UniProtKB/Swiss-Prot annotation:
The keyword Chaperone does not apply. Residues 115-125 have a biased composition (Polar residues). This is Rab proteins geranylgeranyltransferase component A 2. SUPFAM superfamilies: FAD-linked reductases, C-terminal domain (SSF54373), FAD/NAD(P)-binding domain (SSF51905). The lineage of its organism: Eukaryota, Metazoa, Chordata, Craniata, Vertebrata. Monomer. Heterotrimer composed of RABGGTA, RABGGTB and CHML; within this trimer, RABGGTA and RABGGTB form the catalytic component B, while CHML (component A) mediates Rab protein binding. Interacts with RAB1A, RAB7A and RAB27A, but has much lower affinity for RAB1A, RAB7A and RAB27A than CHM. Interacts with the non-phosphorylated forms of RAB3A, RAB3B, RAB3C, RAB3D, RAB5B, RAB5C, RAB8A, RAB8B, RAB10, RAB12, RAB35, and RAB43. Belongs to the Rab GDI family. Residues 113-171 are annotated as: Disordered. One of its GO terms (biological process) is protein geranylgeranylation. The keyword Transmembrane does not apply. It comes from Mus musculus. GO terms for cellular component: cytosol; Rab-protein geranylgeranyltransferase complex. Pfam families: GDI (PF00996), RAE1_2_domI_C (PF22603). It is found in: Cytoplasm, Cytosol. One of its GO terms (molecular function) is small GTPase binding.
Length: 621
């Protein structure tokens, strides 16, 4: 460690996920001295995004379950006084399970002899990436290993040109985050390591047309690794949602850039169709008859102020939204569009009131930035936690990645947490402690019942619904394919989102888990895509996009866990959960705001920063 950290802070935050990062920004903005640490080598925790080879290295790190104690210079037990006790923090992250990787893309020997030799050294079902120690971290502030930083430089990226930009408040900014370097990977299929450069900003852009794509090989994906920014959890943002409102209010929006989600799709009678969202879309639709257009507009108009017409749904409050739609004399395809593509809810678990509220929310978000209710961050959702970390650092927050915390120090008499002891044996005191739940020891979580999220990440060669433009960002909810299964949310990203290489698409699939991720999601993958080898052999419809690469994994969902479920927590220790499986990031924002108001009830949550022109300096002397 190059130099020691200060020994006293107001707030210590462990973990750099979205809720922790929002809290760090809010605390720092209100004048608190903040220390924000993470044992990982990258920002975001389970909200992070990775390059192609970086993701594979991350997978290897999980499978190897590294628990090294490098750099430990003192035994923490010796630093605990007689009047104190310690809560030892977990050293191994166990929130990701059942990782499986499949590579369907061909190996192009001419592209890279060296890459091919590396692949051939591995077995066809298991290959390992470049060793973790040869890869660095993707960290927002560039920093020395375990050294702390009070400055916050942001990754400098040079985006490709776009036709036109529409900003939430945005500005060009410098970047110090090298987005490409991560740690270790060992998975079920081909994995290698190679990298390239990226870029940064915060704006909503229109689509760009690009020339027809060529065949993509695995070697090309490795060479273009840094063109990929692959989210562990990928969520669109409601244009009128609480996260966008917070980004604008706090002026954190200037650190990021967005694009409109251009299409809402539906999976109906075995094919993918585009769903009309706005009034103009409805009446221009060729999929709906004139009678259906009138029926749809009448129902959507009712949903906008459904609270004023409670007599319309009073008798159906306890019914499912699906059953309620059947009473409105809507055709089956309209019911399907409303349930799965507008309300985006479950057929079985969504009540009438929840469905009406979801539909109203969808409609209220239309038109703010584009023709759909959603926008998506360039470079992936992993950018958002980094933006809030940057704001924290701007107001004096201290950041330190690769910095393990061994334990919380608790005063026996008061029951309050007094400080932490890090992996270097340094004791750091604070008034409040915010901890990501993955760091909590098993004893503390013994009564907790977690849910699971099933995730799949795919790289494909074309869109699931081809149009004149190949730069479409699409959201599709696939209804349950069999009784007892759940609906699956599909998000398809084009290369202009800066999340994948040119001529490819990055596809995210998400659902609540009932089995392993592969068991939950593979039926949907088979419905929408065809592995490249089968396409070459002509074994399936050539109209389907070719599947080049796939990753499946399960992620823990702790969003529904209440504080009372944790055992023996000191009163001044607050817990943040990981991502939930729902649409948007409203839960993370609400959690951060609730905890902030609990800790600092008299302070405003993330107020706008002062305008430099309004700052008055007192004359000296």
């Amino acid at each position: 460690m190059a130099e020691k950290l200060p020994t006293e802070f107001d707030v210590v935050i462990i973990g750099t996920g979205l809720p922790e990062s929002i809290l760090a920004a809010a605390c720092s903005r209100s004048g608190q001295r903040v220390l924000h640490v993470d044992s990982r080598s990258y920002y975001g925790g389970n909200w992070a995004s990775f390059s192609f080879t970086g993701l594979q290295s991350w997978l290897k790190d999980y499978q190897q379950n590294h628990d090294s104690e490098e750099g430990v210079t003192a035994t923490w037990q010796d630093l605990i006084h007689e009047t104190e006790e310690a809560i030892s923090l977990r050293k191994k992250d166990e929130t990701i399970q059942h990782t499986e990787v499949f590579c369907y893309a061909s190996q192009d020997v001419e592209d890279s002899v060296q890459d091919t030799e590396t692949l051939q050294r591995s077995s066809p079902l298991e290959a390992s990436a470049t060793p973790a120690d040869s890869l660095d971290s993707a960290s927002l502030p560039k920093e020395r290993q375990s050294a702390y930083s009070t400055s916050y430089e942001v990754p400098s990226r040079h985006t490709e040109e776009s036709d036109r930009e529409l900003s939430l408040p945005s500005a060009n900014v410098e970047d110090s985050l090298e987005k490409e370097k991560y740690c270790g990977d060992k998975t079920d299929m081909h994995t290698v390591s190679g990298e390239d450069k990226g870029e940064h900003k915060l704006v909503v852009q229109d689509s760009i047309e690009q020339p027809k794509r060529n065949r993509i090989t695995y070697s090309q994906m490795v060479k273009e690794s840094r063109r990929f920014n692959i989210d562990l959890v990928s969520k669109p943002l409601y244009s009128q949602g609480s996260l966008i409102d917070l980004l604008i209010k706090s002026n954190v929006s200037r650190y990021a850039e967005f694009k409109n989600v251009t299409r809402i799709l539906a999976f109906w009678e075995g094919k993918v169709e585009q769903v009309p969202c706005s009034r103009a879309d409805v009446f221009n639709s060729k999929e709906l008859s004139m009678v259906e257009k009138r029926m749809l507009m009448k129902f959507l108009t009712f949903c906008l102020d459904y609270e004023q017409h409670s007599d319309e749904y009073q008798d159906f409050k306890q019914c499912s939204f699906s059953d309620y739609l059947k009473t409105k004399k809507l055709t089956p395809n309209l019911q399907h569009f409303i349930l799965h593509s507008i309300a985006m809810t479950s057929e079985s678990s969504c009540t009438t009131l929840d469905g009406l509220q979801a539909t109203k929310n969808f409609l209220q978000c239309l038109g703010r930035f584009g023709n759909t209710p959603f926008i998506f961050p360039l470079y992936g959702h992993g950018e958002i936690p980094q933006c809030f970390c940057r704001m924290c650092a701007v107001f004096g927050g201290v950041y330190c990645l690769r910095h393990k915390v061994q334990c919380l120090v608790v005063d026996k008499d008061s029951g309050r947490c007094k400080g932490i002891i890090d992996a270097f044996g340094q004791r750091i005191s604070a008034n409040y402690f915010i901890v990501e739940d993955s760091y909590l020891p098993k004893e503390t979580c013994s009564n907790v019942q977690y849910k699971q999220i099933s995730r799949a990440v795919l790289i494909t060669d074309q869109s699931i619904l081809k149009t004149d433009s190949d730069q479409q960002i699409s959201i599709l909810v696939v209804p349950p394919l069999e009784p007892g299964t759940t609906s699956v949310r599909v998000m398809e990203l084009c290369s202009s989102t800066m999340t994948c290489m040119k001529d490819s698409y990055l596809v995210h699939l998400t659902c609540s888990s009932s089995k392993t991720a592969r068991e939950d999601l593979e039926p949907v993958v088979k419905q929408l895509f065809i592995p490249e080898a089968e396409a070459e052999a002509g074994k399936d419809e050539l109209r389907k996009p070719r599947l080049l690469w796939a990753l499946y994994f399960n992620m823990r969902d702790s969003s529904g866990v209440s504080r009372s479920s944790y055992c023996g927590l000191p009163s001044n220790v607050y817990i943040c959960s990981g991502p939930d499986w729902g649409l948007g990031s409203e839960h993370a924002v609400k959690q951060a705001e609730t905890l902030f108001q609990e800790i600092f009830p008299s302070e405003e949550f993330c107020p706008p920063p002062p305008n430099p022109e309004d700052i008055i300096f007192e004359a000296e002397g």
